Regions:
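Conserved "right-hand" nucleotidyltransferase catalytic core of DNA-directed polymerases
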Residues: 231-356, 378, 420, 442-633, ...
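Active-site-proximal helix-loop-helix substrate-binding element of RNase H-like nuclease domains
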Residues: 99, 149-155, 159-177, 295-301, ...
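C-terminal polymerase-core module
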Residues: 515-522, 526-578, 745-793, 797-799, ...
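Extended two-metal-dependent nuclease catalytic cores across DNA- and RNA-processing enzymes
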Residues: 19-21, 70-250
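Conserved RNase H-like, two-metal-ion catalytic cores of nucleic-acid enzymes
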Residues: 1, 11-50, 66-67, 71-78, ...
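Active-site palm subdomain of RNA-directed nucleic acid polymerases
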Residues: 471-483, 487, 807, 811-832, ...
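Function-dense linear segments that define catalytic or interfacial modules
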Residues: 337-342, 375, 408, 415-431, ...
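Conserved catalytic core of nucleic-acid polymerases
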Residues: 496, 594, 604, 608-609, ...
């Protein structure tokens, strides 16, 4: 198999979202190329493999025709810089590559394919360039690679499949280009002859030689014959330019390209590029005989198993004296490894296992997790929840390496110990089959597992030593130590507390949904003329657009599109559409919320969600297993559903949320006087915006005007386009565009902020919140317009949304501290974006409501007031 190197890396560059290393080097084209290479190897399993590349020098085609490829744009710098590195990677993978001055990669591929055939080998050409189709024979298959909407597909072109598409033999693709030309290569063809005419001529006459032999007696319109006659010289030259050379002076033998194992040089290259997933995929290990670029981190320690109470007391005394200890625990708390420095610099590791300890295991754990031992760990929140579930203290944690890694790079995606260690130190950690490095689950009492457990604990300590000063350097220490780290304990307590659900009411609600679904189902069958599977998009599309002949149908490869956007446009065309939309809504509620939540109610009658701290790039918390943050609020069904969430007996729920926090932050960050004034005077911001945009006094603002202004306000924060705004509020695009332009005229500070934050992000390579949370934006350096536009939208939005996330987190820490300080029985149990829910005894409700508003409003001090409102009730709906 021979790969068209330039074609594939070019497609990877434009088809893969920009990726960079921590020092800013772009890697997405290389990563995309290697991903495609892996797929091709899995599909074809070739015995021999090589890659062909273009060279920078002019080829014989440039010398013969000055205009050859003259219209092509220069290669983007961020792509050009990756090609030499890709070649280094291929060399390290022991994959031969070919280049030849004066010839293109296509010519080398053509020559290689013919040499393979002569040697009795079949050849597969992998490329995204259709020029190579002329090489298709019984023994050479062209595997065409195409990328659409981020999805890569391949199609094998054989003589048979080619003829099915084109209607002539593969070799005559050159004749086709001789007539119609090739805009991408600036090959002229015959002026005035397009693809349709050229295709018809070649299908009938096969070649330009035959066409010109029969001129002027061919079957064609007189003007076509005239163009062919006048353009013969151009056709002949175009034929020559489009013909791939198959006898280039290239030394090649299939036997010299047999596949080999990667060399030791591949591991450090992948480490440098931060391709940790590919290191795992290829099973690479650090080369023993090649010195690392940096001094490797020594993870060896002097270890001792602690089995007696006396020895445990001795170690606990040492732990209390140490500046810090680094600790990892198994999920069931049956084993704990503690690393610490004894004396001057000696690293010591103490291992505690329940099965080997002769004393009171619970008392030992209580001592280990008390406040007088300062602990560094990984995924502290999860460990704290486990401790709470075992009625153990959760104090003394001074650092969480997972959280630190996330703050230092919020777009890395993986924050397990092995990934962070690889990215930080360019070393991989062994992952024995007996150890799950993400959860640290022992799958057997083995020496191998114990050794790995020690290694991972030492790795966490090394990460702590690397991350702590880096947080200080990037001005992230306050956010980390005052918000993120203390939030771990807050969330652990919230998860442990859970939220009570009225299971009987929820089951009854589900039964009611089932009745509604049956009723809707019968109505839909009556309207459509018979039963069908309403949940099948294919069958639904056939009913709506074929049987009922509704307008505006859009066909896809799998049938008619019946997504929400399509159905919304048809809502008034036929009653069946409204009923289908209702059916989908009820079905979603029943399966996701009724049936789904009933399954996860714990024996204590409560749902214990898990809050994820390292998932979103903006810093927002997310909720899983189950997700309690996505329960709909804008529909009657969603509102009714909140009735199912109730407090413990004798308690109420107190719900407090911020009022328009993102708009208030926008006013502060953008320093727009008009918007700030509206908040300072307590005016309704949407009414003020409507008055500004529509040019009317505030007392003349209609309900619709305010609604449109609200959409504009929140749309601006998220970088909405005129097209999207038009769809949201149901106006023409030009009208939506006028709204946005008028908005920026009336609030010039917002426009200035939007421009300045993008310019600053392009200069720095990142944006940040008021509390210095960063998000890297390699997308801003992309040459692809859509990718770059995405980066600009994120640059405008992230400082606002990210600061809102920081503020609510800080508010949670303050609320939790205050509840404990005032010895209240109230418990913070849920956070949903800008909303906090507390469960408290009836007699504490007023105090808790006041406490919530005070701590939320006092979390940060802005140039505009930050306001929060609190309400209480006997269920979540009433409290809201």
């Amino acid at each position: 198999m021979v790969l068209d190197g330039n074609s594939i890396i070019n497609r990877a560059y434009y088809g893969v979202r920009p990726l960079t290393t921590r020092d800013g080097f772009f890697t997405h084209a290389i990563f995309g190329f290697l991903t495609m290479l892996g797929r091709l190897l899995d599909e074809e399993k070739p015995e021999a493999l090589c890659v062909a590349f273009d060279r920078r020098e002019p080829t014989f085609r440039h010398l013969e025709y000055e205009g050859y490829k003259a219209t092509r744009h220069a290669m983007p710098e961020e792509l050009a810089m990756q090609i030499p590195v890709l070649k280094d990677v291929l060399d390290a993978m022991n994959i031969p590559r070919y280049e030849l001055a004066g010839f293109e990669a296509d010519d080398l591929i053509g020559t290689i394919s013919r040499k393979c055939e002569s040697a009795g080998w079949d050849c597969v050409v992998a490329t995204g360039d259709k020029d190579s189709l002329q090489l298709v024979t019984e023994h050479t298959t062209v595997k065409l690679i195409s990328t659409r909407m981020g999805q890569t597909t391949t199609k094998d072109m054989t003589p048979e499949s080619f003829r099915e598409v084109y209607g002539f033999a593969p070799i005559h693709i050159v004749d086709l280009k001789a007539l119609m030309g090739d805009a991408s290569d600036n090959i002229p063809g015959v002026p005035g002859v397009g693809e349709k005419t050229a295709m018809a001529l070649i299908q009938k006459y096969q070649s330009i030689d035959e066409i010109y032999r029969l001129l002027p007696d061919i079957e064609a319109k007189p003007n076509v014959i005239k163009k062919l006659t006048e353009g013969e010289e151009s056709a002949r030259q175009s034929f020559h330019l489009a013909t791939i050379v198959t006898d280039a002076p290239l030394e090649f033998s299939p036997q010299d390209n047999l596949r080999k194992a990667p060399s030791d040089a591949l591991y450090p290259l992948f480490m440098k590029l931060e391709f940790t997933k590919l290191i795992d995929k290829y099973g690479l290990k650090p080369p023993a005989d090649i010195p690392a670029a940096e001094e490797p981190v020594d993870l060896t320690v002097t270890a001792e198993a602690v089995t007696t109470v006396e020895k445990a007391k001795e170690y606990l005394s040492l732990f209390r004296k140490a500046e810090h200890v680094t600790l990892l625990a198994l999920p069931d708390l049956s084993g704990v490894i503690v690393d610490f420095v004894a004396g001057e610099s000696t690293a010591v590791s103490a291992e505690f296992y329940f099965s080997r300890y002769e004393g009171d295991w619970n008392a030992l754990l209580r001592a280990l997790f008390s406040d007088d031992i300062k602990k560094v760990s990984h995924n502290v929140k999860d460990l704290q929840r486990t401790l709470l579930e075992n009625d153990l203290p959760i104090e003394g944690f001074i650092f969480d390496t997972a959280l630190a890694g996330y703050l230092l790079d919020a777009t890395a995606g993986k924050y397990d110990i092995a990934s962070l260690f690889a990215a930080c130190f360019h070393q991989t950690l062994a992952e024995p089959k007996h150890l799950d490095p993400d959860a640290f689950s022992m799958l057997g009492d083995t020496a191998e597992a114990e050794t790995a457990f020690h290694v991972y604990t030492s790795a966490v300590d090394a990460l702590y030593e690397a991350f702590a000063p880096e947080l200080e350097k990037r001005e992230l220490h306050e956010l980390y130590y005052e918000v993120e780290l203390p939030l771990c304990a807050v969330l652990a307590r919230m998860e442990h507390a859970g939220m009570r659900v009225d299971a009987n009411a929820l089951a009854a609600f589900g039964s009611e949904m089932e009745v509604q679904l049956k009723t809707l189902e019968q109505h839909i069958y009556e309207e459509s003329g018979g039963p069908f599977n309403i949940n099948s998009p294919k069958q639904l599309g056939e009913v709506l657009f074929e049987r009922l002949q509704l307008p505006h149908g859009k066909k896809t490869k799998t049938g008619w599109s019946t997504n929400a956007d399509v159905l919304e446009k048809l809502r008034w065309e036929n009653p069946i559409v409204e009923e289908v939309l209702q059916y989908r809504q009820y079905a979603k509620f029943r399966s996701t919320y009724c049936d789904g939540l009933l399954k996860v109610i714990a024996p204590d009658g409560r749902i214990h969600t898990s809050f994820q701290m390292t998932v979103t790039a903006t810093g927002r918390l997310s909720s899983t297993e189950p997700n309690l943050q996505n329960i709909p609020t804008r529909t009657q069904l969603g509102s009714e559903f909140r009735r199912m969430f109730v407090p413990a007996d004798g308690c109420v729920l107190v719900d407090a949320d911020y009022s328009q926090i993102e708009l208030r932050l926008l006013a502060h960050i953008a320093d727009d006087e008009a918007m700030k004034q509206a908040f300072l005077t307590g005016e309704d911001i949407h009414t003020v915006t409507a008055a500004q945009v529509f040019g009317v006094p505030t007392d003349q603002v209609t309900k619709q005007m305010r609604s449109h202004a609200k959409a504009v306000n929140f749309g601006i924060v998220y970088g909405i386009s005129a097209f999207s705004l038009a769809q949201d509020i149901g106006v023409p695009v030009y009208e939506a565009k006028e709204y946005i332009e008028t908005y920026f005229e009336r609030f010039p500070g917002i426009r200035r902020y939007m421009d300045e934050v993008v310019a600053q992000a392009k200069e720095r390579g990142y944006v940040e919140t008021l509390m210095h949370r960063r998000r890297a934006l390699p997308e801003l350096a992309a040459s692809n317009f859509n990718t770059r536009s995405f980066g600009e939208r994120v640059a405008r939005n992230m400082p606002i949304q990210g600061t809102a996330a920081d503020v609510i987190k800080l508010a949670m820490v303050r609320v939790d501290e205050r509840l404990h300080k005032e010895n209240l029985k109230a418990k913070l149990i849920l956070q949903v974006h800008d909303e906090l829910i507390v469960e408290c005894p009836e007699e504490e409700k007023e105090m808790v409501a006041r406490l919530l508003t005070e701590e939320m409003e006092g979390a940060v001090h802005l140039s505009v007031p930050l306001t929060a409102e609190a309400h209480w009730g006997i269920n979540w709906l009433e409290a809201k």
